Each structure stands twice: as C-alpha cells, then as structure tokens.
Design a protein with these regions (language model features):
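C-terminal terminal-subdomain/extension
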Residues: 297-350
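Soluble catalytic domains of membrane acyltransferases
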Residues: 4, 131-320
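N-terminal acidic, proline/glycine-rich, low-complexity intrinsically disordered segments
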Residues: 1-36
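Low-complexity, intrinsically disordered short peptide segments enriched in small/polar/basic residues
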Residues: 15-20, 41, 295, 307
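Residue-level detector of alpha-helical transmembrane segments in integral membrane proteins
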Residues: 19, 76, 280-283
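Membrane-anchoring hydrophobic helices of lipid-metabolizing enzymes
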Residues: 25-169, 174-180, 184-209, 339-350
Length: 350
C-alpha cells in the first residue's frame, strides 16, 4: 500500500493552499549513504530542494512547484556568472526585502503566493533598469506612512514599467523598505504560466476583495485609476490624465486607508504609440494592442514624486456624485505634481 502511495506522488497542500509534493520514503540503504550538506549539493538538486540521491532535503522538505525550482536554478546560475555590480545589487535587494514588513509563512510564502526569492530575482532586472537605464530620481519618500496605504498614480508608457519603477523606489530607497502590491488587470492571469509568476512576484488580481484583504494586513497597494485608458493613450495626449475610476476611493473609505498621490514624469516618452490593433487585442483577450514606433522603451529619465498622504472620511456606499468629488481631489493633486515635475526637468533623457 505504501508503494502505491509513493508511486502516485499524491499532492497535498499546506494551510495557505500552496501545493506541496509528498515526500517518498528513504531507500533501504539510506543509513549507509555518506552525508552531504546542502551547501555542496549540485545546483540542480539545491534549486529543487533536493538532498543527496535526489530526495527532498531535511532543511527544505516542502519542495514547491517546478516553476519555482526552475526560476531558482536560473537565478543561481546567472548570479554565479554575473558581474560584481549585479551581485552587489542582488545582495542589496535581499537585505532590503528582509527588512520589508511582509507576512511570510514557514515555507517563505505570503497568503497571496509571494515568494521573496523568486521576487528578488525578478526585481533584480527592474533594479538594473531603475539605477542604470532610467536613472530614476525619487522625491518625497519620507511621505510614505507606516502601515496600510494606497499609492495612486498616473499611468502611461504603453508597458507597465512605471509601476515597476515606483515599486523599486519604495524597495530600494524608502526607510523602511516597502513592498508594493500591484493590482493587475483581470485578463493577466489568463496568460499561460503568467498567473503563477504574477503571484510569486507579488502581483494580485485587482478585485475589491483582494485589495481589502491586503490592506487589512497593513500592506501597501499601488493602483492606477486611469487603467488601460492612461497606459495606452496616444503620444499626442501625453501627460493628460484620463478619467479616473472610483473604486480606489471606495476602498480607501471602507478600510480607512490613507492615499499617497504619485506623479511619474518620463514614462510618457519611453514608447511612442501611433494607434491600437484591436483585432489582435481581441484575439488574445487583451484590452488593447498598441502599435509602437519602438517596442523597447527609450532610456528616458524617470522622475517620481510621492506626495503627502490624503485622508478621506465618508460612506463607501455613497452615490457616485459624492465619491467623484473626492476622486477629483486626488486627480487634481496628481495633475499639479505632474505639471510641477515637467517644469522642473531639464531634459527628457538627462
């Protein structure tokens, strides 16, 4: 009976719902095997949490999804071959994430599937862009409150790089570091493999329930009320704020969460859009498929401004007319910050 159980590799889940492979019994001659520490185990075995002979190690018996293992393997190889500047940045990210207020279980996951090891290797790419490609300048990080907050910003650039750069600013430069939870579009998890990856790096589908749960855990949520309207607008409408949705304000009122307005200057010029190819967008169930003059972003210089927190009181179930007045206050603050940033910058690229 035990042999049948081992052969079928029955899967189980822990309290967070993360699948965990069951651990097979050791071989008969396991007692005679020579011990081998995880530190000297082959990189493939370490990546999948395996000990000598391909068995799950005692230190990490919870071997997770193969995607996580492949990500760890690739990250380990790249880290060993990387120049010193990348290795140093990787260590900096590890230290900063260790200091960030995150609620992780004993397996290293939070309730929404975030894994800091996977996230760190992904953030490393964005950190390189942050420091050396977009050369981001962040202002007003001292305005970030402790505990829960809603970061609300303008959205642009055809590709959601602006969200990544805002997130890198709060991880690399805020004191203490803050890991922002991105509220993704509903269609994103429908992309093959992306749903698991999105969860591992901290992304969450932007449902009201997900947002409320995260805020109740005193975490920081970033949202863009313009949505696709802002991100995919033509170049001729750059830095013109589009209509804001009202959902973020209702969430702020429901959870008594301060709103931090954020203005990004530099994102509008990174990709030049001349239109949308909607037939292809519909084919992939995407809200838009922009036609760009450049599909790799230009090295524009990012300026990110964090404003003072805005607090609102009221009934989250009020009529739209009441909520819109509060939304317009946030939109107006962001508009003023954008205009001030445009006046202050000397060049698009420097």
């Amino acid at each position: 009976m035990a042999t049948k159980t081992h052969k079928s590799s029955a899967r189980r889940t822990n309290k967070t719902g993360i699948p965990v492979r069951s651990i097979p019994p050791p071989p008969a001659d396991a007692s005679a095997a020579t011990p081998q520490s995880d530190a000297h185990a082959p990189v493939i075995e370490r990546a999948f949490g395996l000990g000598p002979g391909g068995l799950p190690s005692e230190r990490e018996p919870h071997s997770v999804e193969r995607l996580d293992g492949l990500h760890s393997l690739a990250g380990g190889i790249l880290e060993s071959l990387a120049p010193r500047v990348i290795r140093d940045l990787n260590h900096e990210l590890r230290d900063r994430l260790d200091k960030a207020p995150l609620e992780l279980n004993s397996y290293g996951y939070d309730p929404w599937g975030l894994n800091c090891d996977v996230a760190r290797r992904t953030l490393l790419v964005f950190a390189l862009f942050y420091k050396y490609y977009f050369r981001v300048k962040a202002y007003g990080l001292e305005n970030l409150p402790k505990g829960r907050m809603l970061i609300i910003g303008n959205h642009a650039g055809q590709i959601a790089i602006d969200a990544s750069m805002i997130g890198m600013a709060t991880v690399l430069e805020a004191d203490p570091p803050r890991f922002l939870r991105g509220m993704g579009e509903y269609w994103l998890p429908t992309l093959p493999f992306f749903n698991v990856f999105m969860a591992r790096v901290g992304g969450v589908v932007g449902t009201p329930k997900n947002c409320v749960d995260i805020l109740h855990h005193e975490e920081a949520v970033i949202a863009f009320p313009e949505g696709v309207r802002g991100m995919n607008k033509p170049f001729s409408e750059r830095y013109q704020l589009q209509e804001f949705g009202n959902g973020f304000m209702r969430l702020a009122l429901q959870t008594n969460t301060p709103i931090v307005p954020v203005a990004v200057v530099g994102s509008e010029e990174q990709a030049i859009s001349i239109g949308n190819f909607m037939p292809l967008a519909r084919l992939f169930s995407m809200p838009a498929f922009p036609i760009l003059l450049n599909y790799f972003p230009l090295p524009t210089r990012y300026h990110i401004y964090f404003g003072e927190p805005m607090e609102f009181r009221g009934n989250p179930n009020d009529e739209d007319e009441v909520i819109v007045k509060k939304v317009e206050q946030v939109k107006g603050r962001i508009h003023d910050m954008i205009q001030r940033g445009l006046r202050q910058r000397r060049s698009i690229f420097f």
